[in-house]
Amino acid sequence: MNTLLNRSVICAVFLVQLSPALSAEPAATWPAVTLAPAREVTLSGPLGESLQRGVARLAKPPYSEPWLRADVSFEINRIFTNYSGDASGRFIELATLTSPPGRLSPPALAPLLKTVASFQKPDGHFGVAVDLSKPLPKNAPPIPMLWGNARLLVGLVTAGQQLHDEKLLAAARRLGDFYVDSADQLCSPAREADYRSSGTYGDGYTCCYFPAIEGLAMLYQATKDDRYLKQAERMAEFFTKFDCLPVDHSHGNLCAWRGILDLYEITGKQEYLDRAKAKWDAAVKGGFVWPLGGVGEHWYVCFSGDEGCSESDWLRFSLDLWRFTGQTRYLDIAERLLQNQYATNQCPNGGYGMAHIDCEAAGPVAAIEKVDEWPFCCSFHGPLGLHFLKGYLATGSERGVIVNFAYDFKAPVKAAGQDWLVSVCNKSGFIDGRNSKMEIELAPRDKATARGTLLVRMPGWASGAKVIDGSGEAVTAPVAGGYLRIEREFKAGDKVIVEFQNGLALEGRRFQKMQVTAGQVSRVKDVAVLAGPELLFASPVKGGGRPVLLATLDAAGKLGFPTSGNNLVTVVLPGSDASDAQIAQAVQFGRPVFLRTWPGIVASRHGDPAFVSVLEMGDIGKSTGVKPRRLPFMFDLVVVPASSLAADIAKLAARAKEPQADQAAPIFGTDLEKRPENWAVSQGWKFMPQGLLVSGGDIGLIDGEGYGDYRFEFELTIPKEGQGIAGWVVRAKDEDNCLMFQLQTADSTFKAPEFKTRPNTLRPHRRRNGQWEIAEPVALPKEIHKGEPHQVAVECRQGTVEVFLDGQQIYRQSKVDLRGGSVGFRASGPTEQGLFRAVSLKKL
């Protein structure tokens, strides 16, 4: 290692500009935009494949006609029928919009459309009979009914218009009349306290009532009946009393906001647009929008999962804000969402649901490779967002043809009085050393050639752009208002090639771009690493929290990792304050950590991940029985000059090329407490000259996989500062499935009968899927005290585990159901402390 590392500069970071999410191009003169007709747009590539899989999901179980209709007919017992019209309305909307021309698909759609209106109540609503004059506590019958009716109203209007079906539109009118007629009971300032009493989650008034703004606005556009518009505006005004961040249900909140933008489109009232822009800004600046580009199911800074419905709404909300303002920051966030969080939310069967997230107080830090399908909502709303996206890929205005995204698609566009066919081919390569390219063909529909203006969005992540024609000649393309402007003659077959310069970039949690200084060591915390619009995910990384990774910076200021190119490879460091020697040791001996974008994560899988489709309440939170990968995307980095690692990189690169590098070999040896790079470091672990002090962080394990039979041995001193308890782990399949033993000293003062604590004992534990099972304590053959060193050994052979204290066997267990797994230490907090020395692991 170069001694330059000694001259480290802690947190040598400064903000260089507001990110695309926070910087805005003025768009006071932004003209009206004509969206491409989504039905006529062909979307291919990965996004097109995701949409196709989502639509194909509609033809699979459980989506039979009775299952879908049950939330209005109650003919079968299934999950969430009290949300009357929710699943049926969503299915009707998506299936109608995506059915092939001249045919209704899937087969359940046609009979559902014929029968759904027959279950409408005389007052126009669907579902159980309700008395709206009664109080509305949480989950009162009218509340979930209102949610479902709002989704069904959208479905009925969509199907009525698309299919020119007057019976469906008549049913939509009757449902709209219900909202108008019930306004004095459901939209009354005098009942505000009553409404608030139900909270803001999916069983509360705030979540379930206001989404109908969208359906009422659509009904007005279909009928031009002012009553529906007035009711939607009345609800939008009343909504101001309830809107807030954080809020317990992002999907319900965003449905209301999309409806408010519909009102802006209809009325042109600036207040609606201003309110929507302010909401978006508050969410982004407040940390309620995650580095992944989307939001949580509960719209909090930190929550343990997202919801495909919410990601769809956030996408459409951002797209429409661009449509009405021209500010490309909204498209930058939409692209971030599509490339990251939207992709993580899709299940192997094509459905969408809740993707699990690992959080800390500041926000998410890692994706958990587990998605629970929610077939009652997200599996409709997820594909719906991608369907509407098609209309925004390329659009038209009086200024010309606007290309917003570098995806693979063909779209008919009308711009400045001319009909065009826009074809885009994506050639992006974000982390393999190539710049991102897109090939654009702009062909006039009614003539051989035509002069026109092509506007191509300049992504916020791009540091520059080069434009050439098909023969390689440079094309003039000045940048204004976030777009490259290309004016020329266009004809079928001619291509314009746009190449965006991109590299790795650092970004803070609130989308602020960050830089580190060349020629010195920088130590930065809580950052994401981006390749273009795509976050990098790290694997394999054990333990919780943000891992500390090693990064490099060359003399030109280019960010990288020890091994760059097609594969980004680095190592975990013992801490942000890692010394020169610790960095050198990690590079020489540490387990390779691969940094991949989400497509790379998918490619690295060994088969599809297990998932649960939630078809009944008991499925919520159900385990798949398979431990999912934890994939951090927020890191602490130690950034060193690239030249300082030149001598050590070859060893790391060689290890990264070894077969099964993602599944590291077992680690055996002595003095393992002196090799922090081989441990999944947890908070509360301190690697010191006198040993490894463990005083918190729950379980930490040694790296490696494929452990069989072994002898785990160490010298243990239980410090006087704690309460006389220290623990270690063997046969650890993972942190949630292992054997754990605790020693409690004779002078221990800790008393917790529920945990069977007892002085001067060994306490065996079994952790099964995260739950502790505690056996009866075993009395020690002699007294041990705090501050005394003792030799501990554990031998694991097949299904037998033996524990030795100072050479004497004190415990033996046979028929252990864990036949493999690594070793480690455990302390739940400072009351439990252990100082471990001479740690060894020997293969038997």
Predicted regions and their residues:
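Aromatic (Trp/Tyr) and acidic
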Residues: 25-107, 135-163, 206-227, 231, ...
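Short, solvent-exposed beta-strand-to-loop segments that form ligand-recognition rims
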Residues: 805-822
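Secretory/extracellular carbohydrate-interaction modules
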Residues: 696-766
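Extracellular glycan-recognition surfaces and repeat-rich motifs
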Residues: 673-699
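Short tryptophan-centered beta-strand motifs in secreted/extracellular beta-sheet-rich domains
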Residues: 712-714, 788-797, 801-803
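Ligand-recognition surfaces built from glycine- and aromatic
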Residues: 818-844
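Short, aromatic/His-centered strand-loop micro-motif at the edge of beta-sheets
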Residues: 769-791
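C-terminal beta-rich recognition modules with glycine/proline-rich loops and embedded aromatic residues
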Residues: 232, 276, 331-436, 479, ...
